[in-house]
Amino acid sequence: MTKTAAVILAAGQGTRMKSALPKVLHPLAGRPMVAHLIHALGAVAPSRTVVVIGPGMESVADRVAPLPTVLQAERLGTAHAVAQAGEALAGFDGTVLILYGDTPLITPETLTRMVEARLAAEDPAVVVLGFRPADPLQYGRLITSPAGLEAIVEYKDATAEQRAIGLCNSGVMAVDGRVLFALLAAVGNDNAKGEYYLTDIVALARGMGRACAVVEGAAEELLGVNSRSELAAAEAVIQGRLREKAMEGGATLTAPETVFFSADTRLGRDVSIGPFVTFGPGVEIGDGVEIKGFCHIEGARVAAKATLGPYARLRPGATIAEGAHVGNFVEIKNSAVEQGAKVNHLTYIGDARVGARANIGAGTITCNYDGFGKYHTDIGEGAFIGSNTALVAPVSIGAGAIIGAGSTIARDVEADALALTRGPHEVRPGWAAKFRAHMRRLTGKN
């Protein structure tokens, strides 16, 4: 088995984000940027992964746990950052991937190609991931020859001829673990910033007589996120991928550009998704589900052939069983709607069970919170809840029971019973006309 390790550089302050949240924790498709890299690394199954963080970034350490983190106490450059992983990678003699926490769009396929290139017959010491950006102005150039990669030249130091080269440095590398830390130890800081640049290891490796190589990746994979606008650009890229994946997997998206997925959204076959639907993290949708427009779903499971929306909201803990209906302006939280049940209009179901084939009338509310605790409502199989009903939890409605419209139910109702609490119907003929006449005399108004 190929031995692989990874170092993720995540110590950057991210000042351009203007945020209290560390840059690498900003979410893309419902997942922190750094977590996208960790997920992509699964393709090469690293035996060790180390995340380099800066001072005050304990939240990053918490998020990447159980992966180990090492501290770059002073931000002295990328080579210095990688060197902080020396103890964690002591004795490792395989391929070390070096990634950046703010470059989250690299695909598993590209990482696999990087490792394969490192293990080629030429035995390159360093493999650099290059790309061809539409605007290459700011990037270092990769200087190649028939023998492979010769050097990386920063733009400010490049000649006019070198600046004309379109192949640019992404910073991502795969390095022979047997020489990585020796190369890093040889890097100097004789430059304008007084920093230790990781790019210098290419020339150092060539000076040792070792080959270096380039793998070319798509420019969109190497989009770095340093600002809110770049975060939005990265979101657009990943949403495009997720939409394509959904359609290739057998889902129909009526207006793909209006549907937003989380990275972990799971869709069955023949799912139909209308416009302006948003999937938060933790959603699983079964085969043949219809999701109409303007639904918002997070932390929920929906079984086969259920129908949602339009304008339905499923919150964490919602489970919708096969063939159930959740209609317009319905919110369901931490509740089970069982097989064939219908919750079709203007309803809140929270901390509840809606039994199979039960029917919940428009305007029904489960009153689950008293300001201190949440309480459960249980609605039995085949029960019928009339419109504009308040179910004051904790309360149980038996199977087959009928609740009259407009009721407030605060006590349990046995199976097959009728319960209603509204006052008796009263009609007073002519009363309205007499009232208006009386008020006109009092006010002098017509």
Swiss-Prot record:
Region described as Linker: spans on this chain: 229-249
Ranges where the record places region Pyrophosphorylase: 1-228
First-tier enzyme category under EC: transferase
Keyword presence, Cell wall biogenesis/degradation: yes
InterPro entries: Bifunctional_GlmU, GlmU-like, GlmU_C_LbH, Hexapep, Hexapep_transf_CS, MobA-like_NTP_Trfase, Nucleotide-diphossugar_trans, Trimer_LpxA-like_sf
Sites where the protein binds UDP-N-acetyl-alpha-D-glucosamine: 9-12, 23, 72, 77-78, 100-102, 140, 154, 169, 226, 315, 333, 348, 359
Catalytic activity reported: alpha-D-glucosamine 1-phosphate + acetyl-CoA = N-acetyl-alpha-D-glucosamine 1-phosphate + CoA + H(+); N-acetyl-alpha-D-glucosamine 1-phosphate + UTP + H(+) = UDP-N-acetyl-alpha-D-glucosamine + diphosphate
One biological process term in Gene Ontology: regulation of cell shape
Keywords (A to Z) from UniProt: Acyltransferase, Cell shape, Cell wall biogenesis/degradation, Cytoplasm, Magnesium, Metal-binding, Multifunctional enzyme, Nucleotidyltransferase, Peptidoglycan synthesis, Repeat, Transferase
Region of interest called N-acetyltransferase, as start-end residue ranges on this chain: 250-446
Stated family: In the N-terminal section; belongs to the N-acetylglucosamine-1-phosphate uridyltransferase family. In the C-terminal section; belongs to the transferase hexapeptide repeat family.
Designated name of the protein: Bifunctional protein GlmU
The species this protein was found in: Rhodospirillum rubrum (strain ATCC 11170 / ATH 1.1.1 / DSM 467 / LMG 4362 / NCIMB 8255 / S1)
Gene that specifies this protein: glmU
